Amino acid sequence: MIYKEVQIGEALLRIYVLSNYEDIDINRKRAFIIIYPGGAYCRCSNREAETVAIKFNAMGYNCAVLFYSVNNIDKTEYSPSKQYKTLYPKPQIELANTIKYVRSHCEELNTDPNKITIMGFSAGGHLVASLGDYWMKYGEDAKPNAMVLWYPVITSGQYAHECSIHLLIGEDKALMDMASLEKHVSQQTPPTYIWTTKEDQAVPYENSLLYADALSQNNVPFCLKVYEKGCHGLSLGTQEVTESTKPVVPEIQDWPELVDEFLVKTFRTRF
């Protein structure tokens, strides 16, 4: 395995690339998944980072995790009445530059430049979907080939996750429409897999429904999976990544295989 760390502006990219071998295929070019943990733009959750990368490594994907710019506050201390440093557009620029980095280093990273997926959890899902909607601002080399959104923050409207939206755009009312990503899906938005749970009380599942509907209206290939059970922030749903105060949720543990099926169908092959 090739493991390396790269600075993308103020963000840190941790790369996990599978080695190629003569007795398998020394020239294999794999699909690449870049993972963006959640954390409400307060922090980047470690529960949605390395363990996820290693899970998809085991399925044949090269992976990386981007620890993007956040406010570095405890979510329990967040208050809507406080003023915070506005993050936008720094995380979005970091994301675009990450795709550009991977695409420009494809030979070194044993990667197919036309099979780059961005995968985001919660607020990381908002970050990912924002590039899916707006990648044209950053150029063709920043275009993701597919997206995976896990219990994503999508809207700044009725079902908004207030903390995430506030920390991203602050009090700037002019940016509220921009932050409602369901309004900006187009036929240029890449194929997307979305999953969430009906019991999510932090980021209502309606966020996912809004985005799926927008994808449908624009004829973008997508798959939406809504699990009946499970709270917010499940990650892989295994004991390894489950908080000590929450139960393991076996019902959602099949999602990596479902994502794999979607990506193989989208790319026609994993290699």
Show which residues each predicted segment covers.
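Conserved alpha/beta-hydrolase "acid-adjacent" motif
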Residues: 201-210
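C-terminal catalytic histidine-bearing segment of alpha/beta-hydrolase fold enzymes
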Residues: 74-76, 216-271
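Short amphipathic alpha-helix adjacent to the substrate-entry channel of hydrolases
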Residues: 46-64
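Short beta-strand element of the alpha/beta-hydrolase
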Residues: 29-38
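N-terminal cap/lid segment of alpha/beta-hydrolase-fold proteins
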Residues: 1-28, 88, 162
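Short beta-strand/loop motif that positions the catalytic acidic residue
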Residues: 188, 193-196, 200
